[in-house]
Amino acid sequence: MSKRDYYEVLGVERGATEADLKKAYRRLAMKYHPDRNPGDKESEDKFKEANEAYEVLSDASKRAAFDQYGHAGVDPSMGGGGAGFGGANFSDIFGDVFSDFFGGGGRGGGRGGAQRGSDLRYTLELNLEEAVRGTTVSIRVPTLVNCQPCDGSGAKKGSTPSTCPTCGGIGQVRMQQGFFSVQQTCPRCHGQGKIITDPCTSCHGEGRVEEYKTLSVKVPAGVDTGDRIRLSGEGEAGTHGGPTGDLYVVISVREHEIFQRDGKHLYCEVPISYTDAALGGELEVPTLDGRVKLKIPEGTQTGKQFRLRGKGVAPVRGGGAGDLLCRVAVETPVNLSRRQRELLEELRDSLEGDSSHSPKASGWFDGVKRFFGDL
């Protein structure tokens, strides 16, 4: 008996997205699951067929092979890659199916019981000086907090949750699966044993409400982009008495107009005049601690790098401060007066023919001569 097209099996178009495939498979798995159709051979076969189709189409490489070669591209008996349960991870989708089928008691425990609140993430932008020296900032974070009128219970003030009639208050029900009897989380109360018949009007029975929370964050010295500060218990409130989540403040350091940072070292470019580069001199350069004097030796070329030790960043995790590395950029003079041009022309004439004043140029021209001499 020939196999049906996998797209036909799932009831989707050939251009279906991953979400479309998952939705279609989930629907079929719910419909034909053997536990819902005990003793029905046809349903069992369709369930297996849907599994096989989803296993292939949810895998990018297998789907490409199927699109190009059909079943021959994925059937091991025809030399293909094979289709079954060996190469796919169905834990996420089976979790969804079992959650709906058994009311939250599928793999991993489902939705019932006290649950910890979600962790939150907040991106905090700092300038370089704040990141290097440390600071304290105030932030405003949207979150979910326990509803005050009902104290997080979800029930209207003055009322109390009722015993769940489905499970009798124990939060678990027994489901018959073929020859086995399995205990599952109650689908009505989600394991609480109680149901809310008169919900709180403030939170509509959710037990939590949205609120902005203002917090003070102490940022240690030396942080860098990507570092995280954990504020324990400042995330979303838990449900059904569960603990509160945490807040993670993620550092993002803005670009600086002068300095670039690489770990504990700082870098900057220092423009110097043509004459200072030739004759040498002294100039002031900025650091995060103020200005310092930098001595420029005569004959300094563009790209020369000077290291100011200890003028970088002290890492947040300890250790000595890094260095500040200043890269020199020699500026060619512009907007010259007549007299200045005359002086430069005199200098050029005096240097002409003497390669000792231009060591790099001398080496470069020697290389050019050798290059053309080899041609």
Swiss-Prot record:
Coiled-coil ranges per UniProt: none
CR-type zinc-finger residues: 134-212
Cofactor binding notes: Binds 2 Zn(2+) ions per monomer.
GO (cellular component) term, any one: cytoplasm
Domain J residue range list: 5-70
Subcellular location(s) per record: Cytoplasm
Cofactor needs: Zn(2+)
GO MF annotation: an example: unfolded protein binding
Positions that bind Zn(2+) 1: 147, 150, 200, 203
Residue pairs linked by disulfide bridges in the UniProt entry: none
A GO biological process held by the record: response to heat
SMART domains in the cross-refs: DnaJ
Assembly and interaction partners: Homodimer.
Similarity field: Belongs to the DnaJ family.
Function of the molecule: Participates actively in the response to hyperosmotic and heat shock by preventing the aggregation of stress-denatured proteins and by disaggregating proteins, also in an autonomous, DnaK-independent fashion. Unfolded proteins bind initially to DnaJ; upon interaction with the DnaJ-bound protein, DnaK hydrolyzes its bound ATP, resulting in the formation of a stable complex. GrpE releases ADP from DnaK; ATP binding to DnaK triggers the release of the substrate protein, thus completing the reaction cycle.
Protein name (database record): Chaperone protein DnaJ
Organism: Pseudomonas putida (strain ATCC 47054 / DSM 6125 / CFBP 8728 / NCIMB 11950 / KT2440)
Gene: dnaJ
